[in-house]
Structure formats: structure tokens, C-alpha cells
Amino acid sequence: MQEQILASCVNLLATLNQKCLFPCNNKGFFIEFNSLWTFFFV
């Protein structure tokens, strides 16, 4: 169950950041992605 929730959050995060990926040179996405993993696993 937790994996499905995590996958949904990652998909949502990717969708929200899709417009920003190239202009931000991926930095914004990876910072938020790392924060998401920290939230789930720390």
C-alpha cells in the first residue's frame, strides 16, 4: 500500500514539475524528489 502511495506522490510531483524541468535544469525537481524520499523514509 505504501509503495502505491509513494508512486502516486512521485507521479504527481513529476507532473507538477514537468513544466519546470528544462528551465530549472532539473534542480527544482531533484530537490523536491529528495525531500519526498526523506519524508517517507526518515
Swiss-Prot record:
Keywords per UniProt: Leader peptide
Name of protein: Aspartate-semialdehyde dehydrogenase leader peptide
Organism: Streptococcus mutans serotype c (strain ATCC 700610 / UA159)
